[in-house]
């Protein structure tokens, strides 16, 4: 949702630019992200968004705020599962984007949280990016001072992280 950065610098805006360069006029990107959103909020908003946009592909990158608030993994899983089901009922392909939470939440919780994404990807046979922030934590000036949100400098890498999985869906 471009937290703490100019929304024009966000990876979704970079995606729009890349798609327009590589496939002019073919794809329309609707960014429905909201800073601070939880899976519950996303689930409540999704039916109207599906009606409005009738997407061919739905990218679900949600749950980080749930995890940071310590929500039970089964609640997060159920909300994400319902979002996947709603999207698939509309014949949209789903790309599930995995998120990890900081290790200070404890091994048991962080493992259960991470397993939410991998188990859903397997159960629903989804395109899946296990860890969206791959190569971001290690890069210089890639994370904001909060240690949670990527900087504007990280946005091209985020797009590069998601692109291979997204491209597979775009080419179908």
Model-inferred region functions:
Residues 1-4:
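Short glycine-rich His-centered loop
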Residues 8-11, 38-42:
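Conserved donor sugar-nucleotide recognition element shared by glycan-biosynthetic enzymes
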Residues 14-21, 25, 30, 41-172:
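Alpha-helical cap/lid subdomain in secreted, periplasmic
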Residues 33-35:
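Short, solvent-exposed turn/loop segments enriched in Gly/Ser/Thr/Pro and often Arg
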